[in-house]
Regions:
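Charged alpha-helical initiation segments
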Residues: 2-6, 16-18, 240-364
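Amphipathic alpha-helical repeat scaffolds of TPR domains
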Residues: 2-16, 38-58, 80-109, 137-153, ...
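Residues in the short coil linking paired helices within alpha-helical repeat scaffolds
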Residues: 22, 60-63, 117, 156, ...
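Single-residue signature of alpha-solenoid repeat helices
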Residues: 26, 64-67, 121, 160, ...
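Flexible helix-coil transition and linker loops at the boundaries of alpha-helical arrays
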Residues: 30-44, 71-87, 125-140, 169, ...
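Charged, amphipathic alpha-helical oligomerization/scaffolding segments
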Residues: 120, 202, 209, 313, ...
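Elongated, non-catalytic scaffold/linker segments and compositionally distinctive motifs
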Residues: 126-297
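Short non-catalytic regulatory patches outside canonical folded cores
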Residues: 345-397
Length: 397
């Protein structure tokens, strides 16, 4: 056995110590290996991820930081060009760990949204995702899962669910993606109205599947297994009859047979791109997933008959504008002979810069403008709802 192969074996042994939760032994072994083999490329590359995992396990900010700094340094070294995707991935995990060690859930939400470590993690994950298709399924699933965790920490829960779905497309039984998706779904369960029970049941079943998966500890360590088991217990407390949690949930697929050609396209297009406003996130191929029931609930003083109606007008207008923008988007993607003929009646100058002008492009541009206008109205609504001391701008409902 040559020296390089021996080092790989030692690195593998350190990784096993981490998976078993023996972090102090792992850091001692890594430091000893570094001392014996200074400036070794294999060690320099692998220690980035090892330091981050060990520091996270020991809750040692400085060890994690050391791993991140080492990784950032290697990214600037052209001799590690072939390893940059793995480096981006490890560094992103490091920034996530720095965030988790520095802040907790009780902190001000502004420190989450603008947190430098979270933003750095998001950027590094995205860099890794650009070229991830060249890697094996295991790495791709883990990358999408960790990116989902980052989005969830940023308060972008719906996008996090989409990231977990990407991981599960690669491996439908990937335990970390399955468990983390279930935990993200739990957040939405309590605000999903009539879907609350079904979402808790689905979350419980997914968590059990993840916690019983023999590969869970390999990918997430002992902490992930304990975390998932704790979530299962929390869900069980919500149900007097625990047998309900084993119920087989059925979601009959929506019926397209009675629809016109465009309506069918519209439903499938909006469903594919998740454009409907509902919390039926545990199943997207049934009738409940292709409607827009989302609204708000609020408590007003007895005798106050105006506040809720005034707020409702804001929401109605925002939802109406959204529905129109969505319709325009779908129309821009649906080729029709009558629109083709109408488009031909308007002459456009060829500006020689590859710009496109026609009815379909116009519909797409209008959808974009309408959507952007909605953002202004949402900001105005938030200002009114929370009675923020911000000057009004010319936004009309």
């Amino acid at each position: 056995m040559n020296k390089e192969h021996e080092m790989v074996q030692e690195i593998y042994a350190i990784s096993n110590l981490i998976n078993k939760g023996e972090y102090q032994k792992a850091i001692d072994s890594l430091l000893n290996l570094e001392t014996k083999n200074p400036e070794n490329r294999t060690i320099n590359f692998n220690k980035v991820g090892l330091l981050i995992d060990i520091g996270c396990g020991l809750k040692d900010f400085d060890i994690v930081k050391k791993g991140v700094v080492a990784g950032e340094k290697l990214l600037k070294d052209s001799s590690y060009e072939d390893y940059k995707v793995t480096l981006y991935y490890n560094i992103a995990n490091g920034y996530m760990s720095l965030y988790q060690l520095e802040y907790d859930k009780e902190r001000d939400v502004e420190r989450i949204v603008d947190n430098e470590n979270l933003q750095n993690a998001k950027r590094k994950f995205r860099e890794a995702l650009k070229e991830v298709n060249h890697f094996d399924s295991e790495f791709r699933s883990q990358l999408w899962t960790n990116y989902g965790n980052c989005l969830d920490s940023l308060g972008r829960g719906v996008e996090a669910l989409y990231a977990y779905d990407e991981a599960l497309k690669i491996d439908s039984n990937f335990p970390i993606a399955l468990g983390n998706k279930a935990m993200a779904m739990r957040f939405f369960a309590d605000i999903s109205g009539e879907y609350r029970e079904a979402m808790h049941i689905k979350s419980s079943q997914m968590l059990k599947s993840a916690s019983e998966n023999k590969d869970l500890v390999k990918f997430g360590g002992i902490a992930a297994k304990k975390g998932f088991e704790n979530e299962i217990q929390q869900i069980e407390k919500l149900f007097e009859d625990k047998r309900v949690l084993s119920k087989n949930l059925k979601h009959p697929k929506y019926d397209l047979s009675y629809m016109t050609k465009f309506e069918k396209f519209y439903i499938e297009f909006c469903s594919k791109h998740k454009l409907f406003l509902n919390f039926h996130i545990h199943e997207d191929k049934c009738e409940a997933s292709i409607v827009d029931p989302i609204f708000i609930s609020m408590v007003t003083p007895i005798g106050d008959s105006e506040t809720y109606n005034n707020i409702a007008k804001y929401i109605n207008q925002i939802k109406e504008d959204y529905a129109i923008a969505r319709l325009l988007l779908a129309q821009s993607q649906f080729k029709r002979e009558d629109l083709d003929n109408i488009s031909k009646r308007t002459t456009f100058v060829n500006t020689l810069d590859y710009s496109m002008f026609n009815i379909y492009v116009g519909l797409l541009k209008s959808a974009f403008k309408e959507t952007y206008n909605i953002l202004d109205k949402i900001s105005r609504f938030i200002k009114e709802y929370y009675k923020l001391n911000i000057k009004n701008k010319n936004i009309y409902f």
